[in-house]
């Protein structure tokens, strides 16, 4: 794999810390003028092949895969351009802001025989595979509950009127898209598509800072709790 990384955030640093354990031939990174210093710092620290501040330059290079680690609302736009340039795409969660965007990306990838996937690894963990294979042996569930709640480091700024992407509804922020998506992914991977879904959220300044998603599977219910305004016990 010849990998092109979009972004310089914490999640990118996490990936780069394990990059030498992966079958990756070369790495290039795309930053912005605003993150220029950080981009060059990462480029040097992890001995990358090149760094870029122009997406077209990166797409013209010999990379074969693009990893999209940008704010949620940018996933679709940058992934689409990568696919149209015949690059495989790995996208951080949530893969897109809505279903219509995802359908279009899948269509393009299928037409060009490319791979597109969301960077959620729970499906590949041995413990998850064991759980899925033995779920019927455990017995029929009645209530399945998952909780991913952590007090966001950006929440205090949000309360003071500083709206960062993680709390901006125009940029696909909020508890559902940022945290609860992990719970939903886990439940759907185990049990498939629910019959009915209901989301009840705590709304502050037009964004869900926390919420409960109820998934109805007829014979049992799944409850997904996600919060950025408080933490779980």
Region locations from a protein language model:
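N-terminal Rossmann-like dinucleotide-binding module
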Residues: 1-46
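Beta-loop-alpha module in the N-terminal Rossmann-like domain of NAD(P)-dependent dehydrogenases
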Residues: 15, 46-106
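Conserved acidic residues
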Residues: 27-29, 49, 64, 142
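Glycine-rich beta-alpha junction loops
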Residues: 35, 123-124, 147-153, 203-204, ...
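Short strand-turn motif at the edge of the Rossmann-like AdoMet-binding core
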Residues: 93-94, 119-122, 148
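Rossmann-fold dehydrogenase core element
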Residues: 104-121, 140-144
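Predominantly a Rossmann-like dinucleotide-binding segment in NAD(P)-dependent oxidoreductases
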Residues: 125-195
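Contiguous beta-strand/loop segments that form the cofactor/metal-binding neighborhood of enzyme cores
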Residues: 184-233
